[in-house]
């Protein structure tokens, strides 16, 4: 790739790597508990090979005959928080199109996020950052386990989920936000099992090696039939470090450069939305888009 792209990617990954702290209030009943007029839900549980992490996976199947090619399917990280954001009015909206199977991959917790587990599961080796002035240092988390988690996902969770379902493998998609977005981006770079990748507000500044920088030598042939969507808001939350607007521009230029090399990559920019606000907006956009409908308004 061009020297301009190399410099642009480098600038993005040397930008400040602040991590937003998620809301960790216990969740109430979700749509699977309440029931839906449009989808039916099942659950499975899994344990990591080392016994350290424990997963709860919700599968939502439309009460509608699958298309001839099979249902689209969207695997969604941070599944506890995803399930908390779904309601029957939105599922009805999906039902009006070609509704996807929804697979929400969460953890065996009452909280929206298992911060320690996701820090390991969703990340490559990460940078460490000195705390900003006036901010307490966060306790260190174990990171760098994305290859291990991806193996569990693609070799166990996906085959078991799809065993008795008619799925269109070309419409097998994955979505993640923040650390989850970083996981999705790295999975795309490694041309994994999925055909469609939705990377929302990826925590790019945290990686020791940028997944995009590592993509400079990608062979476009390996990515034939694969699509990457980069979703980011341009709003700045209080206390967020400077440089976000420059990072957005770099991300846009990166998308253009990758697309010019024959890769199917799109950048969706959401005016005024902050990192945290992008969680719900991006998951709804991905589900709508996969159902054949227009994603929520973006540029």
Predicted ranges, named:
Residues 3-14:
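Bacterial N-terminal signal peptides
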Residues 17-71:
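A domain-start/cap signature at the N-terminus of enzymes
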Residues 69-152, 156, 160, 164:
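Serine-hydrolase catalytic machinery in alpha/beta-hydrolase-like enzymes
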Residues 166-177:
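Alpha/beta-hydrolase fold nucleophile elbow
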Residues 181-191:
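Short glycine-enriched nucleophile-adjacent loop
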Residues 193-204:
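A conserved short beta-strand
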Residues 205-269, 273:
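The feature captures the conserved acid-bearing segment of alpha/beta-hydrolase catalytic domains
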Residues 273-280:
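Catalytic histidine-centered segment of alpha/beta-hydrolase-like enzymes
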């Amino acid at each position: 790739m061009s020297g301009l792209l190399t410099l642009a990617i480098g600038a993005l990954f040397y930008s400040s790597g602040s991590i937003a702290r998620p809301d960790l209030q216990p969740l109430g009943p979700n749509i699977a508990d309440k029931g839906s007029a449009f989808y039916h839900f099942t659950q499975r549980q899994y344990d990591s090979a080392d016994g350290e992490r424990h997963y709860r996976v919700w599968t939502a199947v439309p009460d509608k005959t699958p298309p001839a090619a099979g249902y689209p399917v969207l695997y969604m990280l941070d599944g506890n928080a995803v399930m908390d954001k779904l309601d029957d009015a939105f599922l009805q909206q999906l039902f009006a199109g070609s509704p996807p199977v929804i697979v929400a991959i969460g953890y065996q917790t009452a909280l929206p996020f298992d911060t320690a587990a996701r820090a390991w599961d969703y990340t490559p080796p990460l940078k460490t950052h000195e705390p900003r002035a006036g901010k307490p240092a966060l306790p260190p988390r174990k990171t760098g386990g994305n290859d291990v988690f991806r193996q569990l996902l693609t070799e166990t969770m996906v085959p078991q989920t799809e065993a008795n379902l008619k799925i269109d493998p070309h419409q097998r998609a994955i979505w993640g936000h923040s650390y989850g977005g970083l996981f999705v981006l790295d999975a795309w770079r490694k041309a994994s099992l999925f055909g469609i990748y939705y990377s929302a507000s990826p925590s790019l500044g945290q990686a020791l090696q940028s997944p995009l920088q590592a993509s400079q030598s990608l062979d476009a042939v390996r990515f034939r039939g694969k699509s990457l969507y980069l979703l980011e808001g341009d709003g700045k939350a209080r206390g967020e470090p400077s440089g976000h607007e420059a990072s957005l521009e770099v991300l846009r230029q990166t998308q253009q450069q990758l697309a010019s090399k024959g890769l199917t990559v799109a950048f969706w920019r959401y005016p005024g939305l902050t990192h945290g606000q992008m969680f719900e907006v991006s998951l709804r956009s991905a589900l709508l888009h996969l159902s054949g409908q227009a994603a929520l308004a973006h540029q």
